[in-house]
A protein has these predicted regions:
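Mg2+/Mn2+-dependent nuclease catalytic core
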Residues: 165-170, 470-487
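Structural motif
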Residues: 145, 462-464, 498
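Phosphate-binding site recognition
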Residues: 1-423, 438
Length: 516
């Protein structure tokens, strides 16, 4: 049994170092940031270590050399100068009114003013912030460090409420704008968040702020690389493997499949989700830990409102580089926010045309997201969908395709009246979701491009080739399978190949018949 402590929910660097928690050393990259620049912005998904990173910078700039014993920066840094640090954490609050945001910022300013004093003519938030920075510099004789954790949290909580969003925008624009005018007093400024909102002029006013979100040098600043995982947690992975009756290599492969796959820049190594890694090693149970901590309800509602074709999202999206530079709240494109929230990641890059390929990073996110979609697009409750998908897979494994299609009929019959009024594309999307979910348990492919069968499911004994027709017959579906040669790739496989033509009735909004 491992005696090391997992820092789940612990974001304070000093506590982690003093109390013997696991810590993966990122201090060489921090040193590089400190020595090559002064103003930074970094976007990363939630629970990826941004808060711990800022806490580590705070300890560094406060000159707490003893906390860095044995870490890379201990050998790199020789001066260990002490600076006043203003650390603003907007992460753990609820922002439901302009007054609430004002009170939270005012409360933080008051804490700083207790330490550095307050000018009698400083009445606005921006005026007080400016005064604190100036006095901290004057009283200590050292330039000031400003760290802002989750600068965009109020804005994210106001999405969908345009009036509230505009109020927050005005408040934060004035507040963060102080950082430009206070430049002569500042040594280092670092803002982190999930999203880069274009309308908040932190980025237009602070032209010296470097957005390192996509920089290859800092692609591994947050999260865990495979090498870091193996170097740090080898004994713990062995325990995880033993508890799940699998080999060490199988445990690593399963962790990789579930939790790896994030890429925050071009040609980056894969990054593991740190929250899921720590939780699976502590609990010794494979589960969707990161996905369960935040439901993407707002993102799914955006997909529905914009009538975004889910099949494109589920298979991968080509996105121009301009999409990464900002997020406009009034945009009809939900993909930038879905990407920045951690549900999509960079998987490839076309250098000639400057386009990125975005896909789900791993199985935790892929199947967590698709499962979450089911109630929104089918009306089937989360508690029931596992029953449906499990039965679908079992019936195809046993060769009982009639039972599978009969159950699929029942699945569509459960739709509410509102869902039955949906468009033809909606039903195509539902078919798509069903077959994608089956991919958790068996080899299931579903078509998004022409020239292939609508769906192919491979089980140990059978290969099923499906063709669905909405405005045509099951006979026409079978003919298309033959005419297009959809069976040819599987003829030498050795498993029994079964072709199935399925006829979907637009009037009944359900499968009407099928032929084999």
């Amino acid at each position: 049994m491992s005696n090391k402590i997992y820092p789940i929910g612990i974001q304070n660097f000093e506590k982690i170092r003093n109390d013997g928690y696991f810590y993966i050393d990122k201090t060489a990259l921090m040193y590089q940031m400190v020595k090559t620049g002064s103003y930074y912005f970094l976007s990363r998904p939630r629970r990826f270590g941004k808060s711990l990173l800022l806490s580590t910078f705070e300890a560094y700039f406060e000159g707490k050399k003893e906390l860095f014993e044995g870490l890379a920066i201990e050998k790199l840094e020789t001066k260990w100068e002490k600076h006043p640090v203003l650390h603003l954490d907007l992460n753990a609050e609820k922002y439901d009114s302009p007054e609430r945001l004002y009170d939270i910022l005012s409360r933080q300013l008051t804490l700083w003013e207790i330490q550095y004093g307050k000018g009698i003519d400083e009445n606005t938030l921006s005026g007080r912030f400016s005064g604190v920075i100036r006095r901290a510099y004057e009283q200590t004789g050292s330039s000031v460090v400003v760290l802002v954790d989750e600068y965009d949290k109020p804005l994210l909580q106001a999405l969908g409420n345009d009036v509230l969003l505009d109020e927050y925008r005005k408040t934060l624009k004035a507040f963060y704008g102080v950082l430009k005018s206070a430049d002569r007093y500042l040594r280092f400024v670092f803002l982190t968040g999930v999203t880069k909102f274009s309308q908040v002029s932190v980025f237009s006013d602070l032209n010296q702020l470097q957005d390192i979100t996509l920089w290859p040098d800092y692609g591994t600043l947050c999260g865990i690389t495979l090498q870091e995982l193996l170097d740090t947690f080898q004994p713990e992975i062995k325990i995880l493997a033993a508890n799940n009756s699998i080999s060490y290599d199988d445990a690593v492969q399963r962790m990789t499949r579930l939790y790896d796959g994030y890429h925050f820049c071009i040609n980056s190594v894969g990054i593991f989700n740190p929250f899921s890694v720590l939780n699976v090693l502590k609990s010794k149970v494979f589960d969707n830990y990161w996905f369960q901590t935040g439901t993407p309800t707002f993102l799914v509602e955006m997909l529905q409102e914009t009538e975004y074709d889910l099949r494109t999202l589920l298979d991968g999206i080509e996105a121009p580089s301009s999409m990464f530079s900002e997020y406009r709240v009034d945009s009809n494109n939900p993909i930038p926010l879905i990407y920045q929230s951690g549900y999509l990641t960079i998987k490839d890059f076309d250098r000639e045309f400057g386009n990125y390929l975005l896909q789900f990073p791993n199985d935790e996110v892929r199947y967590g997201f698709i499962n979450f979609l089911v109630p929104f697009y089918t009306g089937v409750r989360n508690s029931d969908q596992g029953f449906y998908i499990g039965k679908f897979v079992q019936e195809l494994r046993s060769g009982d395709y009639d039972a599978f299609l009969t159950r699929l009929q029942a699945f569509f019959a459960d739709f509410t009246y509102e869902l039955n009024e949906q468009t033809e594309r909606h039903y195509q999307v539902v078919f798509y979701i069903v077959f994608k979910l089956m991919g958790q348990f068996t080899d299931a492919e579903v078509r998004s491009a022409r020239g292939r069968a609508d769906a192919v499911v491979k089980t140990p004994k059978y290969i099923y080739v499906f063709e669905f027709k909405l405005h045509d017959t099951a006979e026409a579906a079978l003919k298309q399978i033959d005419d297009k040669g959809y069976l040819i790739p599987y003829q030498a496989d050795g498993r029994e190949v079964i072709k199935i033509g399925v006829e979907f009735s637009a009037e009944k909004r359900n499968i009407s018949r099928w032929l084999v």
